[in-house]
C-alpha cells in the first residue's frame, strides 16, 4: 500500500483463494474471510475459472452450493460490488432468492429464467458500518485506517519522522500495533 498498491476486498469475479496482484490492485484472497469455509472459497474460484465470471448474485447462487450465512459474509465484505447494488439491497435479494431455491436448479440451465427485480427503497450505509464489517470478517479494516475510526482527530504531538529530534523528551503519539 505504501508503494502505491490499492488494497481491494475480496471479489467473486477478481479474487483468488490466496491474495493476488492485478496491476496496482491487491485483491485479498478468500482465505482471509474468517467465517467462510475454505472448500467454498476454493469452489468460488474453480467455478469461475471453468464457466466464466459471475453475472449477478442470482447467477452466483445458482452455481455455488452456499447457504445464506456464506452469502451474507460475501455481501458484507463487498464481494458483489460488481453488481452496482448496495449491500442492504443485495441482502434482501439473497434472502428472496434462497427462500425458494431448490438445489436441483443449480448449474447451467438451457434457458435462463429472468430474476424478478424488486423496487426497494434506497438504504444508505455508513462508512463506519463497512469498516466494522471488514474488522469482523477480515480482522482489520481495508477501506480506512484504524485511526479514521477514532472519535478524536488527535494523532499525537510527534510523528515517527520527528522522533530523533525529540530524543530523551517525553512525547505523545498514536500507533497501530500489528
Locate the predicted segments by residue.
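OB-fold and OB-like beta-barrel modules that bind single-stranded nucleic acids
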Residues: 170-178
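Sliding clamp-binding short linear motifs
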Residues: 1-167
Amino acid at each position: 500500500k505504501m508503494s502505491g498498491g490499492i488494497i481491494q476486498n475480496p471479489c467473486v469475479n477478481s479474487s483468488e483463494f490466496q491474495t493476488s496482484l492485478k496491476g496496482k490492485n491487491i485483491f485479498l484472497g478468500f482465505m482471509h474471510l474468517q467465517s467462510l469455509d475454505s472448500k467454498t472459497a476454493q469452489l468460488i474460484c474453480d467455478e469461475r475459472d471453468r464457466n466464466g465470471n459471475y453475472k449477478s448474485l442470482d447467477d452466483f447462487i445458482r452455481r455455488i452450493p452456499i447457504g445464506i450465512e456464506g452469502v451474507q459474509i460475501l455481501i458484507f465484505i463487498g464481494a458483489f460490488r460488481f453488481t452496482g447494488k448496495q449491500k442492504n439491497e443485495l441482502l434482501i435479494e439473497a434472502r428472496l432468492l434462497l427462500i425458494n431455491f431448490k438445489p436441483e436448479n443449480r448449474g447451467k440451465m438451457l434457458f435462463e429464467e429472468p430474476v424478478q427485480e424488486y423496487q426497494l427503497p434506497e438504504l444508505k450505509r455508513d462508512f463506519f458500518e463497512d469498516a466494522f464489517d471488514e474488522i469482523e470478517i477480515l480482522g482489520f479494516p481495508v477501506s480506512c485506517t484504524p485511526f479514521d475510526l477514532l472519535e478524536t482527530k488527535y494523532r499525537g504531538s510527534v510523528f515517527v519522522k520527528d522522533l530523533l529530534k525529540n530524543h530523551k523528551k517525553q512525547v505523545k503519539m498514536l500507533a497501530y500495533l500489528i
